[in-house]
Amino acid sequence: MKEMKTTAQVLVDCLEAEGVDVMFGIPGEETLDLMFAIRDSKIRFIPVRHEQGAAFMADVYGRLTGRAGVCLSTLGPGATNLVTGVADAYLDGAPLVAITGQVGTDRMQLTSHQYLDLTAMFEPITKRSKQIIRPDTVGEIVRLAFKHAEKGKPGATHIDLPQNIAKMPADAVPLKRQQMHDVYADPTHIAAAGKIISEAKNPVILAGAGAVRGHAASAVTELADRLHIPVVNTMMAKGIIPMDDKYSLWTIGIPQKDHVNQLFDRTDVVVAIGYDIVECAPAKWGAREDMTIVHIDSAPADVNKRYQPAVEVVGDISESLYEILRCAHRTGEPEFALALRQTMVAEHEAMAADDSCPMKPARILADVRKVMGRDDILVSDVGAHKMWIARHYDCYEPNTCLISNGFASMGFSIPGAFAAKLLYPEKKVLALCGDGGFMMNSQELETAVREKVPFVTLIWEDSSYGLIKWKEQEQFGGEHCYVDFSNPDFKLLAEAMHCKGYRVEKADELIPTLEEAFRQDVPSVIVVPVDYSENMKLSKHLKQVCAQK
C-alpha cells in the first residue's frame, strides 16, 4: 500500500497545481518538512537574505504575471520580517501568497518560544489569512488563498502551517484551478457612461493601476484617440498610454500641484479607469462637487465624499471601454490640453539639458531613458527620486515602470528588480533608488549574484532621506532636521558582494556607464551624486505655475 503523503507534501503538490514555479524565502526550524517537500518538487526555491526581500520579490512577480507570487518564512521574527512586503502587495493590489511556519498546535495555548498568533497578525494586511489545523483541509485552504489573491482587486493572502500538522499524513489532494470568467458590465451603465462622455465639454481620463492589471492599455489609448480625450495616469499606471501619444498628459500624484492640475480645474467629467483611491487621493487631482465622475473598473468604487461616481461601469475594463466606444461620439480637439502638453514637453526638455555634476534629477532620468528600450523595466524605490520618476521618466508600455504607491515602502526596488529580471532575462532591468532605500535591502544583491540574475542598480546619492527633507523644507521655511547621514563607499560595497561597481563623476559619464553595466553578466551598481537643490526649485516653480492658471 502506498504511503500517504504528509500535509507539507500535499501543500507543495497544491502549489504545483496552482502553477507555482518559483518561491522566495528563508527556511526555519518550523518549515523543515515543507523545505524538503519543495526540494523534491519542480518548484525553484530562492533563499534570500531577509524575508522582506522575499515578500517584495513575490509582490513584483505577481504584478508582472497576474499570478500570485509566493514567499515563505518561519514563525516569529521570520514572519514579522515578511509583513512590510505583504502589506505592500495588499495595498498596491499585487497577487501574493505568504506561507509561514508555526509552532505545533499543542504549544499554541501556552507561552512559547517565538510564538505569535500569525493568522491574526496577517489579517489586517491580507484578503484572507488562514491556518491549516486539519490535514484534510490543505487543498481547500491553498486553492482559496490563490483564488482570493488573484480575483477582483488582487492582493495578499496568508497560509499558516503548524509544525506538527506539517508532519501528519494528509488525506487530501489539490483542487483544480477554475477558469476565471470575464464579468461584463450592465449595458444600461455602459449607455449612461457613453451619454455622459458624449455630452462632456472638457472630459479627462484618469487611468489608474486597475487599468494596467486589467490589460486595458490598448482600449484606453483607443478611447482617448477616437474621442479626443486627454489622459492623465497615476504613478502605478505609467505607460497605460504611450507618453508620445498626443493625448498623454503624463502623471499625477506628486505632493505639489502640477501642470496637470490645471486640466482637472477645467474639467466637467472625469472618466476614472481602474482608479484606486489608495494610490492617489481625489484631493490630489482636485475632485469637486460639480464634477461628474464615471467609474470604470473591474470592482465597484470605494466612494468617499470627494469620489462619488454618477455611474459605475463594473466589469472587464477593456470590454467596457470598447462598448462605450460603440455608443459615445465626440468631435473637436481638446485645445487647452494639447497646448498644456506642449508646455510640459518644452519644460521637461529644458530641465534635462543641464550638464552639471552632482547631476540634476531630470538629466539623470533623460539619460536613463536614452539607454532603456521601450519595453525595458525600471523599478523605482520610494523617496524624492520617485517624484522625479513620476514626473520625468517617459513610459510607453504598462508595467515598464514599477512603483510602490499604495503602501509606498522604501526598500522595494532591489528585490523588485530581481523578480523582474528573473521573469524577463532578455530585458534591461534597472533598480533606481536613493541611498536611504538602497541600504534597506541592499543585501539582496548577494542573492542576485548567487542566483545569476544580472540587473543594474542606480543609486542617487545625497546622504539624506531626501523626500522628507524636501517636505520639511517646504513646511518649515527651508529648514530641515534628522534626515542627514553618512554612507559607505557604495562602489566598494558592491564589489565586496561580487557585483560590478561604478561611480559617475561627470554628467557625460552616465550613459556610457549604464551601457557598460547592462552588458555585464553579474549585477552592477552605479552611484551618481544627485543635486537635490532642484527639489525646492521645482516646488517654487510649480507654485508660480498654479498661480498663473
Language model features with spans:
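Phosphate/pyrophosphate-binding active-site segments
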Residues: 2, 195, 289-386, 493, ...
